[in-house]
Amino acid sequence: MPTALPDHFFHRDAQVLARDLLGKVIRHKAGDLWLAARIIETEAYYCAEKGSHASLGYTEKRKALFLDGGHIYMYYARGGDSLNFSAEGPGNAVLIKSAFAWTDATSDENALAQMQLNNPDASGAMRPAQRLCAGQTLLCKALGLKVPVWDAKRFDPQKLLVEDVGQTPERIIQTTRLGIPAGRDEHLMYRFVDAGYARFCTRNPLRRGQVEGRDYLFLDQGN
């Protein structure tokens, strides 16, 4: 059995949590398989800034954002499911923006094959393993995570958990979040990417035309 991170791990500042989640592995039990993905991209959100759902106020649908750190907040984005974890402070959370399919003794090649069946490409063909979770809705589709099942729930070590498997990014890229409308704090650098996996995330922050110090920053391990 995998070992789940304790709930108190998530009860920390959203930016700290967003950085600390990089390299951790999400595991979801599907039948007798543990589907798994290594987190490579996260975004932090605060109640006090305009880019967050919580800034729009408390509703029953958003209640997970206002619960203790470690609650699951899921919603629909562009027709697909999205996964967030509540952080310290009411209304603060981390969006799991993308991940990289993970295999080990717990989550083997059969689990990877199931993820590929869950998330074919637009033509119905098998999606390459490195692109299976390259976006927030692709991630949830590959792992089989659904809003009605997991929204406002706690982790269940028998079904859904986040595990520390000893993977720590050597460098982290800090940059602006994606899809934030103009005038809603789109300038805030609350997006964090494992530099070693930058080309596999939602949008590569190191792509041509991006300038270090203007468009992104490098955070060395421990910063």
Swiss-Prot record:
CDD domains: AAG
Domain of life (superkingdom): Bacteria
Record-linked Gene3D superfamilies: Methylpurine-DNA glycosylase (MPG) (3.10.300.10)
Pfam family, one: Pur_DNA_glyco
Primary enzyme class: hydrolase
Similarity section: Belongs to the DNA glycosylase MPG family.
Protein name: Putative 3-methyladenine DNA glycosylase
Organism: Pseudomonas syringae pv. syringae (strain B728a)
